[in-house]
């Protein structure tokens, strides 16, 4: 069981292989052989998109579709949580908390860091990167990834776990 002095690690998960790999990597590198006294309190966070963010706010018929979209998003969240629990169990890690919070993953993960006073945030990398502004004088990301956003906004160390590329 985690002690009062144990630092907190937040791991962001979604339904991607990159997220699964990041959780497995984290457990292998930080929690292997430490089932009695884990080095971190582990908090696994899944950001469930809001139905309106998936459907969009306008358009005919959007209101009728929202309950179906919400139902699907809840099912996806349940699968993500179940998979995370299975991964933890397979690695003999039993002392962890899983949270599902509705909202944008970028904000949810940064808020989880604050809420839990986390010293480290672990996220997977999809490898898309940020789409930069066309203006050469600007270094502002117009659109960016969750990992990029968290690296710049989370008030803790951010570890971005990238799956090794397969050799052809």
Short names for language-model regions:
Residues 50, 103, 134-136:
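Primary recognition of RNase H-like, Mg2+-dependent phosphodiesterase/nuclease domains
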């Amino acid at each position: 069981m985690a002690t009062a002095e144990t630092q907190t690690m937040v791991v962001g998960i979604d339904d991607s292989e990159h997220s699964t790999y990041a959780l497995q990597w984290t457990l292998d590198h930080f929690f292997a052989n430490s089932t009695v006294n884990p080095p971190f309190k582990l908090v696994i966070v899944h950001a469930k998109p809001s139905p309106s963010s998936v459907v969009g706010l306008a358009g005919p018929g959007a209101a009728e579709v929202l309950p179906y979209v919400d139902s699907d998003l809840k099912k996806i969240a349940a699968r993500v949580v179940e998979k995370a629990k299975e991964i933890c169990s397979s690695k003999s890690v039993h002392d962890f908390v899983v949270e599902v919070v509705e909202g944008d993953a970028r904000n949810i993960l940064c808020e989880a860091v604050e809420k839990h006073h986390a010293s480290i945030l672990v996220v997977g990398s999809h490898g898309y990167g940020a789409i930069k502004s066309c203006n050469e004088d600007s270094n502002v990301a117009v659109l960016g990834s969750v990992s990029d956003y968290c690296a710049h906004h989370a008030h803790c160390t951010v570890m971005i776990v990238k799956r090794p590329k397969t050799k052809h």
